[in-house]
Swiss-Prot record:
Changing D212 to A/E: Abolishes production of active form of enzyme. Pfam families: gag-asp_proteas. It comes from Homo sapiens. The active site is at D212. The chain crosses the membrane at residues 56-76. Keywords: Aspartyl protease, Autocatalytic cleavage, Disease variant, Glycoprotein, Hydrolase, Ichthyosis, Membrane, Protease, Transmembrane, Transmembrane helix. It is a single-pass membrane protein. InterPro entries: Aspartic_peptidase_AS (IPR001969), Asprv1 (IPR033539), Peptidase_A2_cat (IPR001995), Peptidase_aspartic_dom_sf (IPR021109). It is found in: Membrane. Its EC number is 3.4.23.-. One of its GO terms (cellular component) is membrane. This is Retroviral-like aspartic protease 1. GO terms for molecular function: aspartic-type endopeptidase activity.
Amino acid sequence: MGSPGASLGIKKALQSEQATALPASAPAVSQPTAPAPSCLPKAGQVIPTLLREAPFSSVIAPTLLCGFLFLAWVAAEVPEESSRMAGSGARSEEGRRQHAFVPEPFDGANVVPNLWLHSFEVINDLNHWDHITKLRFLKESLRGEALGVYNRLSPQDQGDYGTVKEALLKAFGVPGAAPSHLPKEIVFANSMGKGYYLKGKIGKVPVRFLVDSGAQVSVVHPNLWEEVTDGDLDTLQPFENVVKVANGAEMKILGVWDTAVSLGKLKLKAQFLVANASAEEAIIGTDVLQDHNAILDFEHRTCTLKGKKFRLLPVGGSLEDEFDLELIEEDPSSEEGRQELSH
């Protein structure tokens, strides 16, 4: 063991070295040493509690961090997902009108005049243009000599669609149109919520056809026509006759649509007027029923077509009435009951 004097000498020597290690410019200032916080260990002291809690803390801290990151991700993702859902809802709402119809140019010779004007009027109705918009698109669609006919009209006449139409037809002639098999004036008196449905299809689109013996013509809603044809205006033919509803008003008709109706495996040719005549998507009137010699039995709720008997579903009936299927009986001796397209 060393003597107390030797220990004192070593301590003074260390203090002397520390003093000489300080920069000359830094005067020695005597500062009181701040006491260490009571919660921290002193030098050389180990707290057993910290050793025991260290592994636990090393697990909890990353877990909490991951939790906060996950919550932040969810908070950022929810508005985006909500936005996507809202957009999807908007698209589904817009599904009924997916097309922005634009008239093709007309120079007087590229298209038969009355067919072009009919197509233009259909586009006007589908797009719900006002009068000013209709006239603007009319002028912008004209080319060449057709535009010359328009420019030679007075400003007042240019603002009247009927006058412009008459001038174009007079300038380029109207070829004879094929006569329609329909009468000149027809009264459309549907059953107004009464009647029976047939379940079928047009193309690949499922349709509930209202069988209405009170309607002289068959009608489909423009939305159904657009869904089946993808808005193909070439599928519409002009309708020159007049159809009046029960109150005497004239029905606005976009055109005549020749298509095929599928009832089970049976296909029938049918001609529909495309018009927003009622809330029904499709109405089968007496014209189609008579063309195919349909036999309606309202007592037993059946409709017989080409040897096939189909169930009629009551309007406003319960869902239980709409069980699978339509075809309930077939006459095996009937050659007309085959799958070919019936005329």
